[in-house]
From Swiss-Prot:
EC number, as in UniProt: 3.1.1.29
Any GO BP annotation: protein quality control for misfolded or incompletely synthesized proteins
Source organism: Bifidobacterium adolescentis (strain ATCC 15703 / DSM 20083 / NCTC 11814 / E194a)
Site (Stabilizes the basic form of H active site to accept a proton): 99
Protein name from the UniProt record: Peptidyl-tRNA hydrolase
Enzyme class, spelled out: hydrolase
Reactions this protein catalyses: an N-acyl-L-alpha-aminoacyl-tRNA + H2O = an N-acyl-L-amino acid + a tRNA + H(+)
Length: 199
């Protein structure tokens, strides 16, 4: 029987050298949710830091798990699939938060299904769950310069940090990402898209 829990997974890379990098937008947004709903993380089978909480909005309570995979980005699916199988959480109750280079910094797009858009963490989750039909909160980090060394530029870009102006805007942006995940859970995907995608 499917669980009534939701699973929110914020993607990133573990370890201090990746803290505060563009690729760790998911981790940072998960930390905002953890603080907001008093979630404490502990180890899940060496695959993820996992916590459990209850959200209360508009007089409704929703139980959820909050995960930060420890597998490194490209194997994120191992962690998400393990947690969803262990706790019997269906894909339609999964929200994944991740960085997205196709969106300018500060923009958020909510979607379910569709292409992984070149994001290796999403490709891994699609593969491990056997479906792309889960909700995603795409957090814009802007684009590396194209050119002869496009791949290297991209890697350096996502593993780089934010400039001073962006750092100032980051707390509000992360709070918006957390709001987007909550809106999906409480009001549904279409409402979340209406609220966040047009900004």
């Amino acid at each position: 029987m499917a669980s009534d829990f939701w699973l929110i997974a914020g993607l990133g890379n573990p370890g201090s050298k990746y803290e505060g990098t563009r690729h760790n937008m998911g981790f940072m947004t998960a930390d905002v949710l953890a603080e907001r709903w008093s979630v404490n993380f502990s180890d899940h089978k060496g695959l993820a830091m996992l916590g459990k909480g209850v959200m209360n909005l508009s007089g409704r309570n929703v139980k959820f798990f909050l995960a930060k995979p420890l597998t490194y980005m490209n194997e994120s699916g191992n962690a998400v699939a393990s947690i969803s199988a262990y706790y019997q959480i269906e894909p339609d109750h999964i929200v994944v938060i991740h960085d997205d280079m196709d969106l300018d910094f500060g923009r958020i797009k909510v979607k379910a299904g569709g292409s992984a858009g070149g994001h290796n963490g999403i490709k891994s989750i699609d593969r491990s769950l056997g479906t792309p039909k889960y909700a995603r909160v795409r957090m814009g980090v802007g684009h590396a310069q194209r050119g002869a060394h496009a791949h290297d530029n991209t890697v350096n870009w996502v593993l780089g940090g934010f400039g001073p102006d962006q750092r100032k805007q980051l707390p509000e942006f992360l709070a918006d990402g957390a709001d987007a995940a909550e809106t999906i859970i409480f009001d549904g995907l279409a409402k979340a898209q209406e609220r966040f995608n047009g900004r």
